[in-house]
Design a protein with these regions (language model features):
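Short beta-strand->loop
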Residues: 144-155, 173, 291-302, 311-313
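A structural signal for short loop-to-beta-strand junctions that line the ligand-binding cleft
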Residues: 120-129, 144-185, 213
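Mature extracytoplasmic/periplasmic domains
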Residues: 306, 311-375
Length: 391
């Protein structure tokens, strides 16, 4: 997986030519900026698949295996010794091949799309994708329906996450974690360059003192969402003109060199090392690192969810459902959070376990957000077919 890429003249040209991106992006390969623009045209706005996912033979009864592809920083101890994952393996007898190669939704989906379109196995039994991409998989018939009899703990799902537009009733997906996109800074470097200890707005990223020391996320809904919110727009109900105004800002900052990189999870090592001073950033990546700080802009943060799906033709569907059920047990969900996965758990009843293991962590609004905190967040709207064509 490409962790991050410099904005080359070629990729900058792609941004300048956004209106022609459908033809230009055909040969864009893995350029992060191209992935960003492609995200503008990816939607999954219905909960009924246009085609039925191909179901392969479930070998779970004879093969105690599970291959799980996830994002980095989403498992306590990255699934190693003493983690919740090893507990699941011991309790279930299932050997889990757990990998963290998902850097952004588009890059990962592109890596398996050919198999999915040809109705060939991807080799994965669980993949974790953000709402909008999960919707695309479901709509395209790339995800298998869940057997809820194998997941009785799904009843513990946060009620607000049950009836989502892309999967009403959660027949194909279950949330893994939710989180927020705001602004992360390297405290020492940011203070040295700006003389400030905190950042209050997206506009603060455009300070000339930070030129070339800024990155933005390749997740279009987060970066464009934050910019539109800074312009006073509601990202749950914006117009094409609103989107184009925000895109014009981003174009200008890329063309001027203010923005150094467009990146997925690869921004984090750069932020930790001080190569960059600030970035649009995901809450759980930055929270807990004493050298970094994460801020909700005054205009608000975006709120998103990453979801577990079982790909079409997965070989170990029942084993995958057993893993989902394990992590929806409140005690296991609490151990996962207490182990360092500082995102919003989809299992609010995990809080007593977290309180027992780490009382301070249980007070963290980035894990158990209050209604007041959530009031300053927005969820990016589901794109219509027309908007999909326009963007």
């Amino acid at each position: 997986m490409n962790q991050e890429q410099e904005i080359t003249p070629e990729s900058a040209a792609l941004l300048r030519g956004a209106m022609q991106r459908r033809t230009v992006l055909a040969g864009a390969g893995g350029v992060a900026l191209a992935a960003f623009l492609a995200a503008c045209g990816a939607s999954g706005n219905g909960s009924t698949p246009s085609t039925t996912a191909a179901a392969g033979k479930d070998l779970s009864a004879t093969e105690k295996k599970l291959r799980w592809q996830n994002w980095p920083a989403y498992m306590d101890k990255e699934g190693g010794k003493g983690s919740t994952l090893t507990t699941f393996e011991k309790q279930s007898g299932v050997d889990v091949n757990y990998t963290t190669e998902i850097d952004d939704n588009i890059t990962f989906t592109n890596s398996v799309q050919q198999q999915l379109q040809r109705q060939q196995p991807t080799g994965y039994d669980i993949v974790v994708l953000t709402d909008w991409m999960a919707g695309k998989w479901i709509a395209n018939g790339w995800a298998l329906p869940l057997n809820k009899e194998n997941i009785p703990n799904a009843k513990n799902l946060r009620p607000q996450l049950v009836e989502v537009p892309f999967d009403k009733g959660r027949n194909y997906s279950l949330p893994w974690m939710s989180g927020f996109a705001g602004i992360g800074i390297n405290k020492k470097v940011f203070k040295k360059l700006t003389g400030k200890s905190e950042i209050k707005s997206i506009d603060d990223l455009w300070d000339p003192k930070l030129k070339g020391r800024i990155t933005v996320l390749s997740e279009m809904r987060d970066t464009m969402g934050l910019i539109m919110m800074s312009q006073g727009k509601n990202i749950g109900n914006f117009t094409d003109a609103d989107f184009q105004d925000a895109l014009a800002v981003l174009k200008d900052k890329v063309d001027s060199g203010q923005v150094r990189q467009v990146t997925g999870n690869g921004y984090l090592p750069e932020l930790e090392s001080g190569a960059i001073a600030a970035s649009t950033a995901w809450s759980g990546d930055v929270d807990g690192n004493p050298d970094l700080a994460w801020f909700v802009p005054e205009s608000g943060a975006t709120y998103w969810t990453d979801n577990m799906l079982i790909p079409a033709l997965a070989s170990h569907k029942t084993n995958a459902e057993k893993a989902m059920n394990f992590y929806y047990d409140p005690e296991n969900a609490g151990r996962l959070i207490a182990g360092g996965v500082t995102y919003v758990t989809p299992v609010p009843s995990a809080k007593p376990t977290v309180q027992k293991l780490d009382a301070e962590l249980a007070k963290n609004p980035l894990i158990f957000p209050s209604e007041q905190f959530l009031a300053n967040t927005q969820i990016f709207k589901v794109l219509t077919a027309e908007e999909n064509d326009n963007y």
